[in-house]
Amino acid sequence: MKAICTKLACFLLVLLVSGVAMAESITSPNGQLQLNFSVNAQGEPVYELSYKGKPVINPSKLGLELKNDPGLMNGFTMEDAKTSTFDETWEPVWGEVKQIRNHYNELAVTLNQKAQDRNIIIRFRLFDDGMGFRYEFPLQKNLNYFVIKEERTQFAMTGDHTAFWIPGDYDTQEYDYTESKLSEIRGLMKGAITPNSSQTPFSPTGVQTSLQMKTADGLYINLHEAALVDYSCMHLNLDDKNFVFESWLTPDAVGDKGYLQAPCTSPWRTVIVSDDARDILASKITLNLNEPCAYEDVSWIKPVKYVGVWWEMIAGKSTWAYTDDLPSIKLGEVDYSKMKPNGRHGATNENVKKYIDFAAEHGLDQVLVEGWNEGWEDWFGKSKDYVFDFVTPYPDFDVKMLNEYAKSKGVKLMMHHETSGSVRNYERHMDKAYQFMVDNGYNAVKSGYVGNMIPRGEHHYGQWLNNHYLYAVKKAADYKICVNAHEAVRPTGLCRTYPNLIGNESARGTEYEAFGGSKPFHTTLLPFNRLIGGPMDYTPGIFDTKLDFMGDLPHGQVQTTLAKQLALYVTLYSPLQMAADLVENYEKHMDAFQFIKDVAVDWDDS
């Protein structure tokens, strides 16, 4: 007993000498990860993480800076600390495996800020392959409505790691990845920022999550977030002298970074770590930190393999627009039946029937048709509010006839809702647009958010837009519609809770192969970065790599091979897989196309 008391006294003495007032620690279920949490002498919450005895995250501060209120950053004492263990196995509606184990040890620390009489909870969950933590704000008198000026979560790295990164940006993830040391990011940033339809880079050392790194001693570390709900998307800003990342939230039109009302929580901040790179790919931390499925009936949610009227527009053979006669249009005032067709419109009855016939013959589920609705003549770059109504087709696209024709062949059409960034307009028309889909036999929609946002000044990854994306998914579920969102915020595992979110783009996809290409290693990095948050609708399957016969593109060669295009169906998982090329190009290579027909979109194990 005397020896135990002596050890305890020594431990307390060490804490006092180091300036640490209070401390707690937990380990992962397999004991390989250890989290240490403390409140230092200034009342600042601090955490650190180790793996197999190696430091992964050096001591890092936690907190939030508030607007017009004292911050939640210091002056805290530890009021309570509770530990618990959780272990379950659940089945996803679709995915790479049939069952997922959700096993973690938890530490929930209640902190009291005496000067303001406010409490917050920081909740940590340690899994065998990493950690998640979040801020929780209980209902209380002195912390009710508050505005975030900045979240000050730190991730202090242990050295100048190799990172695989894209520039931090409030409006796009469609950049090529750069491989460099952390210390080299600043010097490489300018060259890494390439033109996009909407972009707002924010810092010479700002990067996006999911961020994959490798240490000199062989550890693989991934930083991301999970369950992004009613909050701004998190980027990371690097102090490149000390190798400390700090969270950097996406602002709104007036510069604020989040409007919260207690009780509420932040998203989870995630750290996946292993000495085996394969464990990063196999990790289910992002999904496990999301809530279970919100729907009782999921029988209507099905994985989809599809073709579509899309690549021929991307590659310049066809157009989204019906006519070239109009420099600008106002919906409801233009009589398209009196306009001269441009002869290159892709979404025609004849062309769509060709895709339907091909899909039916080869067992594909759906046919995407872009450019079917009025408004494409001046859809981009004009900051138009009322840009589409989502229900009025061009004269050469017979909605009822084509859907009946598809149904007779055992195929469905996939709807396309391009918003051109006019989110306010989309929400005004959303119920009508979804009902139009149901009335005409559609059960899936590809939505797009190309260009700058309306309301003007908002960003693609701000709190307002993140709430919109989720609103669209939940509203779609009311109509039993699945959503494939392009140009939206990168996924954070919400497909577990809302499995009708069946697809996302949110990265540099196949379309860039027609615009000069991506770096050769781009698709090898996507599984370690972008796909950590959820599946990607990469739209692979380009067989004919010569594009010069299709239009006037400056780059007439797709930088790929047939073998690579087939491999992408396995390496870039998605329950929504497109065979993106023209049907006539597949008909030349039916031996290779057999692989696309056979490859699964829903796996029991992989």
Residue map of PLM features:
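Bacterial N-terminal signal peptides that target proteins for export
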Residues: M1-A9
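Bacterial N-terminal signal peptides
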Residues: A9-G19
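N-terminal accessory beta-strand-rich subdomains and adjacent acidic, glycine-rich linkers
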Residues: S25-E296
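Glycan-recognition and catalytic regions of carbohydrate-active enzymes
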Residues: V109, D581-S606
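Conserved, mostly hydrophobic/aromatic
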Residues: Y135, A359, V483, T571
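An acidic-aromatic substrate-binding cleft motif
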Residues: Q261-I356, H362, Q366
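Aromatic- and carboxylate-enriched substrate-binding clefts and catalytic-loop regions
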Residues: E370-Q557, T561
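Catalytic domains of carbohydrate-active enzymes that cleave complex glycans
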Residues: H555, Q565-Q577
